[in-house]
């Protein structure tokens, strides 16, 4: 999906999908099921995860404990927890025992949140500007992780991003203007419009066969 500019409703739409915001009209279908009336918890149980633009902090909870909590019934070994942190560009040994509190930068908290989403093995992962506040090396590592998920084809990703490298991963881009679909097509068709600065920042969908 792609919107014309900042303030166009990218984050609002993502939150509606997750159930954080209620739609004023219309319905939300996920894998052919109407989930409009489902709670956040019910949507999460169906395999939908959401990464905030500004993730919350959890004083008193360590990164290790948060990853274990995210994994649910799956018993994560310490090595598995470390691997998820590595995928988002963090040195695991430096973070596992740290609390998710104000001592961490915004970029660090964002990457930790992304790691928890990876640990959940969600069917639908929604990321709101995952590159915000992240250094170039970590961004490259994170992009490699997104590319790997995309290639495996086991999950759908909706990524709100202004970064060309992430946008190019999209299978399909839908441009919405004034509440209507203005353009819809594959990346090769729509991406030149972005390069020409005809359109603004965009959420990107990378999807498997399951429809949203």
Show where each model-derived region lies:
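Helix-to-loop junction immediately C-terminal to a conserved catalytic motif
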Residues: 18
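Conserved ABC transporter NBD signature motif
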Residues: 26-33, 46, 80
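ABC ATPase NBD coupling module
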Residues: 34-49, 194
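Q-loop/switch helix immediately C-terminal to the Walker
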Residues: 54, 60-77
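Hydrophobic anchor residue at the start of the ABC signature
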Residues: 113-114
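ABC ATPase C-loop
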Residues: 117-118
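Walker B catalytic motif
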Residues: 129-130
């Amino acid at each position: 999906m792609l919107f014309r500019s900042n303030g166009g409703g990218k984050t609002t739409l993502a939150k509606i999908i997750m159930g954080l915001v209620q739609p004023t009209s219309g319905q939300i279908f996920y894998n052919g099921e109407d989930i409009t009336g489902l709670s956040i918890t019910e949507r999460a149980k169906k395999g939908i995860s959401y990464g905030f633009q500004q993730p919350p902090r959890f004083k008193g909870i360590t990164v290790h404990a948060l990853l274990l909590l995210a994994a649910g019934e799956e018993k994560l070994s310490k090595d598995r927890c470390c691997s998820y942190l590595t995928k988002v560009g963090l040195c695991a040994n430096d973070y596992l025992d740290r609390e998710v509190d104000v001592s961490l930068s915004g970029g660090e908290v964002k990457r930790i949140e992304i790691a928890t989403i990876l640990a959940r093995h969600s069917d639908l992962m929604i990321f709101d500007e995952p590159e915000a506040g992240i250094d170039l090396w970590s961004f490259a590592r994170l992009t490699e992780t997104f590319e790997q998920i995309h290639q495996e084809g086991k999950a759908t990703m909706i990524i709100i991003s202004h970064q060309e490298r992430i946008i190019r991963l999209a299978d399909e881009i839908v441009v919405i203007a004034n509440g209507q679909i203005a353009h819809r097509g594959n990346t090769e068709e729509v991406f030149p419009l972005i390069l020409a600065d005809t359109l603004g920042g965009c959420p990107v969908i990378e999807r498997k066969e399951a429809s949203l």
